[in-house]
Amino acid sequence: MEDSNASPRMSTEHENTEMHPFEYMFKHFKTQKVAISNAIRSTFPFLESLRDREFITGKMYEDLIDSCRSLVPVDKVIYKALDELEKKFDVTVLWELFNEVNMEKYPDLNPIRRSFECVFPNELSFQGIDRGNPNSQLSLEQGPSASYSQGSLNGSSLDLSSSEGWRSNDRRNSNLMQANQTENHQLAESPGHLDSCELQVQLNNGDATPESYSLLPQHEERAVQLNNEFQINPCFVQLIDVKKENSSFSLAGNQQTRARTNQNEDSEVIELSSGDSDDGENFSEATTTIPSQPAPAYSRTPPTLRTDRRGDTSDTESSIIIRRRKRTGRKKRERLGSYLIRNIKIPMKTSWKTAVLARSANTSSQRRRKRGPRIPREENADFGGAELPAVCGNVQGFLNKEKFKQGIYVRSIRSETGRLFTPMDFEIEGNCEKAKNWRQTIRCKGWTLRELIQKGVLQDPPRKKKENPRNPRQMKRQVNAL
């Protein structure tokens, strides 16, 4: 009875252990959402990458950007995007989250990525993953233990409630591995196949020593799928450094061959030297050109490549730009040289404070230009006559002193034509009515009437009109009317 009770307990525990990795991964992602949102300080390129890879829709992307424009904090916007990723969570979400671009842009994600690697060392492999292909191969070092994570590598959603799929995948993968090992062993024994074989080097997570390589016949041209095929053949390959997992090298006898990529721009030459294999044959060195890529921020071993660069001139270009800026600034200073502040020659290096103090200390700058009189005055003029010459604008006349004393409404000015004017009418006749100041506009021998009144030459006329004496006849009529 005890054995019968133990067997179902063992089966349930085995089922729970097979379901735990993805559940723990999902729970760990949920607990790290706040830390991830704090680590991502800007929306670009995180949201754009999620939209381009269809993790979020275009409408949701626009909503998130509009939230940022509405001054919503960036961490809250990123947290909302992580909520959407939680609904579609699988391993591809973690790959997209910790890709090379994000790790370079957001260095605060490094400790979070390391926490995932520490918790799930066999299920995750961020190192060397092809960003363009989410179905990239994992390291063969994981062996059959990575079978349950391979389903998520192909983008398929994991079923947390069933464990039969995991066990069936384990059995199928182990059988395929045994069949491929026997097939590769037969291929390795026949020397005729060596000329038409490709050496595929697969690296484990970021290490520089390959774990295994597989020899495939060239005429078969079949793709290696992670779910169903593993090619393992014992070999010793000595590498200087290789960045990518999926780099393949073709060997033809003892001659060197080159596998050229589609990109002909900035290239790096990586040397691969193979040691002696089990059958005693010595493979020659194979060189290949692969597109140069910057080392990821989270790489465990810094690359020690011997490179031959042709197009990478960023340092020289930046130094040239700096020299150009210095040269243009020097030319600008030479062109300006010195400048003048109120006839004071001050060099360019003099501070503004010194320039202002020097300007204030100069007495010539404090002098104001005095405007001279527009109409010249007669300094020794004689104002003793009964009439004085009067000028207003283009009109000339004569001012009678006696009539001028009687008041401003008395016609005291006679023009050259013989017409009589009051001072205000004479101002209007001279087209100076806008001034409305006849004491200032009418002049006698260059002196204004105001100045002559102040000097006592003329008497200030009263402002009231002189009342005319009433006609006695009119007064008599008014009395009779009463």
Curated annotation (Swiss-Prot):
Q: Where is the HSR domain?
A: 6-121
* Span of the annotated motif PxVxL motif: 230-243
- Summarize the record's induction comment: By interferon.
Alphabetically, the GO molecular function entries are: DNA binding; DNA-binding transcription factor activity, RNA polymerase II-specific
Concerning PTM, the database record says:
Sumoylated. Sumoylated with SUMO1. Sumoylation depends on a functional nuclear localization signal but is not necessary for nuclear import or nuclear body targeting. Sumoylation may stabilize the interaction with CBX5. Phosphorylated.
UniProt motif Nuclear localization signal: location: 309-326
SAND domain spans which residues? 378-459
Short name of one Pfam family: SAND
Instruction: List modified residues, type Phosphothreonine.
Output: 209, 313, 316
List, as start-end ranges, the regions of compositional bias called Low complexity. 149-166
Keyword Nuclease found: no
- Where does the UniProt entry say this protein principally localizes? nucleus
Q: Where is this region: Disordered?
A: 131-171, 250-334, 357-382, 457-482
Q: Which Gene3D superfamilies match?
A: SAND domain-like (3.10.390.10)
Keyword Protein transport belongs to the record: no
Q: Which terms are listed as keywords in the entry?
A: Cytoplasm, DNA-binding, Isopeptide bond, Nucleus, Phosphoprotein, Transcription, Transcription regulation, Ubl conjugation
Query: In which residue ranges is the amino acid composition biased (Polar residues)?
Result: 133-148, 250-264
State the GO CC annotations: cytoplasm; PML body
Q: Tell me a GO biological process for this protein.
A: telomere maintenance
Compositionally biased, Basic residues: which spans? 322-334
Oligomer status and interactors: Homodimer. Interacts with members of the HP1 family of nonhistone chromosomal protein, such as CBX5 and CBX3 via the PxVxL motif. Interacts with ETS1; the interaction is direct and modulates ETS1 transcriptional activity. Interacts with the MRN complex which is composed of two heterodimers RAD50/MRE11 associated with a single NBN; recruits the complex to PML-related bodies. Interacts with HIPK2; positively regulates TP53-dependent transcription. Interacts with CASP8AP2; may negatively regulate CASP8AP2 export from the nucleus to the cytoplasm.
Domains: what does the record tell us? Answer: The HSR domain is important for the nuclear body targeting as well as for the dimerization.
Q: What's this protein's name?
A: Nuclear autoantigen Sp-100
